[in-house]
C-alpha cells in the first residue's frame, strides 16, 4: 500500500460510524469488487480519495454505469484495476482500448438483477441532508436497491454542500457500515438547447402525442425539442429512467400532472435527476416526484399497466449491439 495507507476492517452488520475521507482507501483490498454509484449519485469525494492513493485500488474491480458527467475511468486508478460497465462514455475510451474497462451490453432492467446477484464487497454511494436534516440518498437510485442487497458493506458519503431531494430514499444508518462527511457539490448536466433541425423534428413528433399519454424521455436535443413543444397537451403522465429540466417545466405548467395514470396517479416516477442546478433545487421541495430503482422504472410488467405509454428517445447512430448513441458522432 502507499505510504501512510492503513487497512480498515469493514464491520459488517454493525451500526454505521463516521470515517474521515482519508480512511476510505483503507477499506479496499486486492480481489474486491466495489460498486460505485453513477451519474449524479457518484461519490465524488470518496473517488478522489481513492485516486489520491492509487495503490489501494490494486487488483480491485469497480462496477459503475457512468454518464458523461462522470469523468473517472476507474480502471486507471491502478494498472491492475478494472472497471465493469454497461454504458460507455468518452472518459472510458482509453480503458476500453487497454482492456482495463470491461463492457457488457445490457438493458437497465437486466442490469439491476445482474448487480443484485453479483458478489459485491463494498458499495460506495452518496447522499445529502434534506431541508429537515434527514440524510437521503442522492438523486440517482437506478441500481441503489440492487447494490444495497448485494453489498457486504455499504459506505455512504454525505455532502453538506447541497440539499437532498425531498422524496429520495432515507439512509437507514442501521443498514450502513460507514458514513463519510464531505462538501461535494451536486452534479449537474447542461440543459440541451435544440438546434433548428431538432426543433423541426420535435414539432413533428409532438403532434403524435395525445392528451393523457404517459411519457418516458431520454438524453439529447431531439427529446428536449419534443418536450418544448408539448405546452398544448393536457393530463400527461411521466414514468422513466430520468427526469430533466424539460419535464420539470411541464410539471410546473400543469401539462404533466399524472392524473391519467392508473398506477402512481399524480406522481412522476423516475430513477434519477439529470439537469441543471434549478432542477435539483426544485426537487428539494417537490413531493410529486417519486424515485424508484430500475426494477420498477424499466420493468415491462409495470409499464404494461400504463396505457398510452410513449417512449421519446433519439439516435445519432446505432451500434451492432443495437445500442443508441444519442449525442456524439465519431
Regions picked out by a protein language model, each given a short descriptive name:
Residues 8-330:
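Conserved alpha/beta enzyme-core scaffold
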Amino acid at each position: 500500500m502507499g505510504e501512510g495507507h492503513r487497512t480498515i476492517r469493514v464491520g459488517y452488520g454493525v451500526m454505521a460510524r463516521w470515517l474521515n475521507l482519508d480512511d476510505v482507501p483503507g477499506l479496499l483490498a486486492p480481489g474486491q469488487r466495489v460498486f460505485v454509484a453513477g451519474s449524479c449519485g457518484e461519490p465524488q469525494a470518496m473517488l478522489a480519495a481513492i485516486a489520491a492513493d492509487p495503490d489501494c485500488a490494486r487488483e480491485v474491480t469497480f462496477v459503475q454505469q457512468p454518464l458523461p458527467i462522470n469523468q473517472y475511468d476507474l480502471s486507471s486508478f491502478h494498472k491492475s484495476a478494472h472497471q465493469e460497465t454497461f454504458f460507455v462514455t468518452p472518459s472510458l475510451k482509453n480503458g476500453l482500448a487497454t482492456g482495463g474497462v470491461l463492457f457488457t451490453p445490457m438493458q437497465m432492467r437486466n442490469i439491476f438483477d445482474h448487480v443484485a446477484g453479483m458478489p459485491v464487497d463494498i458499495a460506495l454511494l452518496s447522499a445529502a441532508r434534506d431541508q429537515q436534516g434527514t440524510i437521503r440518498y442522492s438523486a440517482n437510485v437506478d441500481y441503489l436497491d440492487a447494490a444495497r442487497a448485494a453489498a457486504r458493506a455499504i459506505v455512504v458519503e454525505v455532502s453538506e454542500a447541497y440539499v437532498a431531494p425531498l422524496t429520495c430514499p432515507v439512509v437507514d444508518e442501521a443498514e450502513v457500515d460507514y458514513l463519510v462527511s464531505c462538501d461535494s457539490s451536486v452534479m449537474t448536466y447542461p440543459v440541451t438547447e435544440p438546434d433548428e433541425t431538432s426543433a423541426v423534428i420535435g414539432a413533428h413528433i409532438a403532434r403524435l402525442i395525445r392528451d393523457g399519454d404517459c411519457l418516458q424521455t431520454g438524453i439529447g436535443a431531439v427529446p428536449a425539442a419534443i418536450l418544448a413543444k408539448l405546452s398544448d397537451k393536457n393530463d400527461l403522465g411521466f414514468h422513466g429512467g430520468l427526469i430533466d429540466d424539460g419535464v420539470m417545466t411541464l410539471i410546473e405548467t400543469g401539462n404533466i400532472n399524472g392524473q391519467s395514470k392508473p398506477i402512481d396517479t399524480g406522481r412522476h416516477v423516475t430513477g434519477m435527476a439529470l439537469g441543471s442546478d434549478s432542477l435539483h433545487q426544485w426537487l428539494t421541495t417537490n413531493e410529486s416526484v417519486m424515485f424508484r430503482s430500475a426494477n420498477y422504472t424499466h420493468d415491462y410488467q409495470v409499464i404494461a399497466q400504463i396505457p398510452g405509454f410513449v417512449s421519446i428517445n433519439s439516435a445519432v447512430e446505432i451500434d451492432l449491439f443495437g445500442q443508441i448513441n444519442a449525442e456524439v458522432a465519431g
